[in-house]
């Protein structure tokens, strides 16, 4: 290989590495948590689209952020009663199956948050149901799992296929503790990272990745990009994409 070709190859390799290392955008609540909004998040090129899952009284898995919607508690209502509810955009509250079906038509990663439930038994049941459905639908390679529940995180790590990214949201565990538990990284609130900025380097030194949520202020976006966090979860993915172009 002559010198010119070697220089071109080196430049391409450096560019590829820079692209790979750039902070990636995750749309909070799927831009906003319906099959239609998932497609929107995909259309603007987000790395991932985050959505929240509950297990209903009859074990049906449904997608919704809050524990109660239109006076119907997610955990204590039947699934059909929940999926019959209309959302503000006119879509019905989706089942997990409906949401994942829409996900088949996307390229974006599916970032599933299992909400903390009333007891560990229900969380384990939810983890088992989620993993079975994801496998049936052929989406195992597209999924990442996040949760505030330490028990649910451990269950995802125990039961999901080896190498599946699982992250913890609650914020009290250090990168070293997360590594020991088998987590892929930390997924912490902006306030936690501001309090412990050293955790970014500690996590990277341990081979873990760092996601920060929910970041909507431009100055916070800039600071996190400068700190080289791996992912930023935001309600303003278009604004974040514009900021990333400046780096």
What are these regions (language model features)?
Residues 1-23:
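Bacterial Sec-dependent N-terminal signal peptides
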Residues 21-247:
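Phosphate-group recognition and catalysis centered on beta-loop-alpha active-site segments
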